[in-house]
């Protein structure tokens, strides 16, 4: 009889379904370490990776993050005006929702400080919002009959949708002039998403938009406290305020490996749609800070934002990035918005002046 050594014997009796996940875990752990190594040229603050229960669907006091102002270590690049958040821009309230370029985080829930594997962001939702992010791309899945946020597999991290939405509600309550957009990749029934929004207290804050109507001014959304716009790729239109993303938006391609491959070529959505999603992140084969630093550098991001309208005849409404604190995302958007809102303000003043002159005649 052939003698089997302990190691092969163990391998021979392990079920295949067990051996494969073990190999996957080893591979994931190796890549995770590699992707989260801090590179000197990325110019971004690193944070200690703590053991977090959020990535496993729980939220504890240990997961609380400090804002940049609390830490005194805010190295997120600001615009030339020193403005980080769009609310601080002159003319913000008089601009319409579709004439502001909003910074959006790709796979916003997947972040390093809360222990997610293969993260697309460094910080959690609250920190992102405090830093000036105003749009969140979230993947919604069902686990045991409940709506969760996860990306790819729950092994990489997960959090109940309601938990994330409650975090968003808390921020919006503290900042009454903030407009926020959620863009959902949704594998959950629309009823489950509605249930989570209602439990989090956000349902009453949702703006409803008819596709044939012009988007409202920011000031009107603030006065009516309808400051949350929700777009989804599944179940849109099933209830008021739950918008079909491809009825309102078009997007550029999102599978890009190097800066040279960035284009304005349309991927999904009708060309006539009113909102434009400018996907601006690199994946090779997963997201990483060095890749983000290249994509988010002002020499790359600024001309891409500014060239969007001339290339596509569409305003870059949602600029979607990984690791937003790498590079110059906030500075680039602040400078672009300041120029654009300034032009709109001058145009409005000129129109009022012409109207007044006509009345005098």
Q: Which sequence ranges carry the predicted segments?
A:
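Aromatic (phenylalanine/tyrosine) cluster motif
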Residues: 17-18, 30, 39
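Catalytic cores of phosphodiester-bond hydrolases, prominently lipid phosphodiesterases
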Residues: 34, 41-49, 54, 58, ...
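Bacterial N-terminal signal peptides
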Residues: 21-32
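N-terminal secretory signal peptides that target proteins for export/translocation
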Residues: 1-16
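N-terminal leader/targeting signatures
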Residues: 13-14, 26, 35
